[in-house]
Every structure is written in C-alpha cells, then in structure tokens.
Amino acid sequence: MKIAFTVYNLAFVSNWIERLMPYWENCEIVIFHIANLQGQKEPAIEGVKSYDVSSRSYSEIIDIIEHERIDLWINFNFRSLFELFFQRICALQNIKSVYLEHGFFSQNTLHFKTQKAQKNIWETVNRQLNFWKKYIGVLYHAKKRLQEWRILQQVYFKNNFKYSPFDYYFIFSQREYSLLSNVFPLDESNTSLIGYPIFSSEKDKKEATSAGLKMNGEVLYVHQPFILDGYATISYEEEKKYFLDLEKQLLKKYKRLIVLLHPRENLSTYIKRFADTQIDIIQSPNNYSCFTDKSLIIGHYSTALLYALYFEKPTIILNYPSVKNDPIFQECFPTVEDMENICTIDFQIDINKKIPFAGKENTYEHIA
C-alpha cells in the first residue's frame, strides 16, 4: 500500500509520521509539503519519498500523484486551502482520504489565525496566493466545475465542512467525537476512536505503568507558541519576565521550573535567552517521561496536557499575559487566575475525565 500525507508544517514528520512508520509493514510513504514556502529545510527521511510542492503547479502535482499511484491519503488538518486542495484531489481521483486528528478540537480550530496573519502579512499573502494558484487548477479541470465552486464556497468561506467529507476519521476520544460530529458526518462506520498517543508501543506502555510514578519536586510548564502565532501581544522579553515571576512563586514550594518548549519554537534561541537564569528549557515532543516524575504540571490548553491527565499528575491552568485561555481543560484541571496563589491551591484533577478526553489504548502502535 502507498500512503500519502499532506504536511503543512514539517513538525508533523517527526511528531507523527516517523512515530507511525515502524508499525507499518509493506507500506510506502510519500509526503507532499511546502518547506520552501514555509522557510523550512526539506526533510531527508529514510524510506520516505518527499515532494516539495511550493513552486509546483496543479498539473505538475497531478502528474506526481498519478505517477505514485496513491492508495490512501492522510490529512492532519482540514481548515487551510492547502489541505482542502489535496482533499478535493482525492475526491476527484477516487483516492481514499483520512483525517488523522493531531491536536484537540478547540474554539480556534475553525478559524484562521488572523493575529498571526497580520503580524506576518506579506508571508501570509504570498502563501495564500500560492495556494489559490494551485486551487484554480482544481476548479478549472474538474468535470463538474460549478459543483466544485460551491464546495469551495461552503467549506472555505462558510465552514460547512460536511460538503467535503473524508472517507475515514481517526480521532482521539469520545469528547472529540461529540464535537467533531458537528463538523463532519461521523458515525460508527467511518470513525475510529484511537486514543491520544502517549506511548510508542504497548511495551513502552506496560513498562511505564509498572515503573510507577514519582514526585521529584520539579514543575513542568507546557509551553504554547502564543507570541509566534500572534495570539499574544507581549514581547519575548516580557514572556521571559513572566517565567521569572512564575519561578519566584514556585520556588517557595518546589525545586525548580522546567519549560517544555513547543515543537515549533526555536530551542537554541530560547536557551540563549534564558542562559542567565536557573530556568531549564527543553524540547522533547511526545516524550511521556517528561511528565512522569514531576510534582506539578502547568499549562494553558496544549494537547500535551493529556499526558498530565493520563498520569494523573497535579495540574493547573494558568493565565498567560494578553491571552484568553481556551476552556478545553477546565473540566479536568483547576484554573489559577493569579500566580501568587499557585502554591496555596489544592490541585485536584478529575480522573473520571481521563478516558473521555484521552481515549483508550494511547499508542502509536495501536493507531498504525
């Protein structure tokens, strides 16, 4: 079987594709990405065929797809014109399409990141023009042009995603099923609840469970790229002050603060920025061991907080300067409005939310 992936950001390669590959037998992997358009370095992955379609036309992309003879196409997202472009090609070329959930559904999922677009206006304009040039090919070459135009209007401009459904949906949990049922026509025949992947394999899962959990006195802060994505109006230096103020409060009770940096942020830049502090900056996507020995987890609405929920770690939702928290995890974790109260609150979590939110199985092996 030949499986293709739409890769908007190369972080999906290391965070998902490379984690799934060991469990696929007799499968060829092809990725279609826009590294050049995104200013990223093109990946070189053993066993994976890679196509940068940044500067390729609709006709050139179709030629590649027909040459590769794709059996199954996987999308991690469904909101951008880039992803809709490949989804419509699948529908027109009779290629089975799959939506593989990579992050929790939130109030931001169905909306464009307008703050980020305004912050990087010319990059955004260039990227959107690139997508539109490609998509015009879909409209022009389709046998039912009027129908394709109506689908574009409904999906892209009106958020009516049911006009362009996937063939299959792999989503984390019952919570996600309930929400995404309002977006896509989900039912038992086309949807699988796969569980959020905490572990690589069943073996890792058993080893972690048998090892037990520890409390080492350290605090793990799960970072979100609020500044990078344009959600926050503060500067990186102001963010540094925010972390230093947080550390000052935490040291009244805990040993040290560790910041788990978001995968899309630049690790070396952050390490240099915090070189004159005692705050540790790490970047270790999909590594459950970052959570198992911590005494407290702090976050906002990152999907990575599912690790904390899975391991039943004391966890709080903390306000971030100039950003309104998404209410995703308010059902699971307490919210602290003022960081001065961070060491005085009893951090009780609702473990009954574990399966409804994180699902079952929870391995890449199971998803594959």
Predicted regions and their residues:
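N-terminal pre-catalytic "stem/leader" segment of glycosyltransferase-like enzymes
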Residues: 1-119, 232-236
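Short loop/turn segments at strand-loop or loop-helix junctions that form parts
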Residues: 7-8, 32-36, 100-105, 195-197, ...
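Conserved catalytic-core segment of nucleotide-activated headgroup transferases in glycan assembly
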Residues: 16, 196-269
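Catalytic donor nucleotide-activated moiety binding site of glycosyltransferases and closely related
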Residues: 33-45, 222, 244-284, 326, ...
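Donor nucleotide-activated moiety binding/catalytic core segment of transferases
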Residues: 53-65, 260-311
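Active-site proximal beta-strand in glycosyltransferases
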Residues: 91-115, 119-139, 220-222, 316-318
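A nucleotide-sugar donor-handling region in carbohydrate enzymes
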Residues: 130-228
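Catalytic binding pocket for nucleotide-activated donors in carbohydrate/polymer assembly enzymes
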Residues: 303-361
